[in-house]
Amino acid sequence: MPVEKFLKDFTIPEKIEFLKSQDDGSYGKFTIYPFERGFGVTIGNTLRRVLLSSIEGYAITAMRIQSNNKDSSSKVVSSEFDLIPGVSEDTLEVIANIKNIHLKLGEGEQRKIISFSVSGKDTKVLKASHFERDGVEVFNRDLVIATLSQDVNLDLEFQINYGRGYVSSEQNSKYLEEVNVIALDSIFSPIEKVSYSVEDTRVGQRSDYDKLVMEIWTTGVISAKDAIKKAASIIREFLFPLIDFEDNINTSFEKSKSESSNLLDMSIEKLDLSVRSLNCLAKENVRTLGELISKNAEELSKARNFGKKSLEEIIEKLSSYQLFLGMSKEDALFVLSKNVKISE
């Protein structure tokens, strides 16, 4: 029996209902139905595993702490087992608190280093809100990081990265060049919890169809609604190669990859940017789409006469094509090969 004819006998989900959420979008409850018997568990379990393992996010991957005391003595914390003078908590507890900060960088940013100082005289308690600077957004601002004595001043430096899943401190340490910088193990996932259940639902005279009920809790870095969309997209990308085993799928991919490479050589004038933005980019010798995405937001912001509005315009224009600043050429080619069209 041909596959196409066989699939006509399947009942495909027609309704996706967003039942409830929190105001910040960090919680969502969804129902998807009707499924043929057994497909509710299959789809629910797959979505749950992908949500918990594969949604990208941000985490602090390294830190440097220097304690300066009233008697002019100073100490750089050299390891997680070292003490921080003037801080009530031990270093392991401080690190545990730091790893619980839920934060996010600006659009398209994948790495940032932030530095700041706090004085025990002015700040008795160091909180996650102190990390909210230089475009960093914090979602649990009231989280306590450390308690400071009155005569201590701390110079702090933290590295924030974009990633997926769990990365050990040993892996993060490979990318550190400075001494007295402590690498942290990092959990990038913005998903806190996922649960699902399957209920019976009726279609016509039959009541043996599946209704999938999913609940998603996030840190706030991504909304529950966007998280389930992203998980479904990831599953689709993994299953796409299985749809057609013919050799022409490889030929088609190579053709689309070649066309995508040509698009990276396209003039930025075809992006319909404002004259001001185009002039600023021209002064930085950015003339093609490929040259534009190779720049990160920080580089462009430092350009002369390059304002916030121009940066926002460029980020918005690139995002409409699923591209972003600081994107690698390989990632851009992959995205463009998925039939993302840019008008000539």
UniProtKB/Swiss-Prot annotation:
Molecular function terms in GO for this entry? DNA binding; DNA-directed RNA polymerase activity; protein dimerization activity
Task: Please indicate if the UniProt record lists Electron transport as a keyword.
Answer: no
What EC numbers are recorded for this enzyme? 2.7.7.6
Q: Where is this region: Alpha C-terminal domain (alpha-CTD)?
A: 259-344
Location of the region described as Alpha N-terminal domain (alpha-NTD) in the Swiss-Prot/TrEMBL record: 1-246
Pfam families in UniProt: RNA_pol_A_bac, RNA_pol_A_CTD, RNA_pol_L
BP terms from Gene Ontology: DNA-templated transcription
Q: What cystine pairs are annotated?
A: none
Q: What would be one Gene Ontology cellular-component term for the protein?
A: cytoplasm
**Record-linked Gene3D superfamilies:** 5' to 3' exonuclease, C-terminal subdomain (1.10.150.20), DNA-directed RNA polymerase, insert domain (2.170.120.12), RNA polymerase, RBP11-like subunit (3.30.1360.10)
Would I find Transcription among this entry's keywords?
Answer: yes
Q: Keywords assigned by UniProt?
A: DNA-directed RNA polymerase, Nucleotidyltransferase, Transcription, Transferase
Catalytic activity as recorded in UniProt: RNA(n) + a ribonucleoside 5'-triphosphate = RNA(n+1) + diphosphate
Q: What does this protein do?
A: DNA-dependent RNA polymerase catalyzes the transcription of DNA into RNA using the four ribonucleoside triphosphates as substrates.
Entry similarity comment: Belongs to the RNA polymerase alpha chain family.
In the record's own words, the domains note is:
The N-terminal domain is essential for RNAP assembly and basal transcription, whereas the C-terminal domain is involved in interaction with transcriptional regulators and with upstream promoter elements.
Name the NCBIfam families on file.
Answer: PRK05182.1-2 (NF003513), PRK05182.2-5 (NF003519), rpoA (TIGR02027)
| Binding partners and assembly | Homodimer. The RNAP catalytic core consists of 2 alpha, 1 beta, 1 beta' and 1 omega subunit. When a sigma factor is associated with the core the holoenzyme is formed, which can initiate transcription.
Protein name stated in the entry: DNA-directed RNA polymerase subunit alpha
Q: Please give the organism.
A: Borrelia garinii subsp. bavariensis (strain ATCC BAA-2496 / DSM 23469 / PBi)
Q: What is the lineage of its organism?
A: Bacteria, Pseudomonadati, Spirochaetota, Spirochaetia, Spirochaetales
